[in-house]
């Protein structure tokens, strides 16, 4: 299951006035890794996406989200993967890495 959220860019003049709670509300990404879910946050800062994927005993498929306006997630994007857990496999077009 893929869950996603959207973040607007903040005005630099406004950010200078944010208190701790406001900074956390606008910039902190919580619950990035949830078992058997794909968590994505689409940010208007350079239109980048931060995501966490934690497969536990099953495969998860990275699918497009509405903000991308494309059939596949990587139609117009590149992807970097950092494994911070145990051993894992990424399958792309039937090839396992």
Predicted regions and their residues:
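Glycine- and acidic-residue-biased ligand/ion/polar-headgroup-sensing regions
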Residues: 42-60, 68-97
């Amino acid at each position: 299951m893929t869950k996603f959220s959207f973040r607007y860019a903040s005005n630099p003049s406004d950010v200078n006035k944010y208190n701790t709670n406001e900074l956390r509300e606008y910039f902190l990404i919580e619950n990035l890794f949830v078992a058997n879910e794909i968590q994505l946050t689409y940010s208007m800062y350079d239109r980048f996406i931060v995501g966490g994927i934690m497969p536990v005993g099953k495969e998860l498929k990275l699918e497009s989200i509405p903000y991308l306006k494309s059939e596949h997630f990587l139609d117009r994007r590149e992807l970097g993967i950092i494994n911070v857990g145990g051993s894992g496999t990424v399958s792309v077009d039937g090839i396992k890495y």
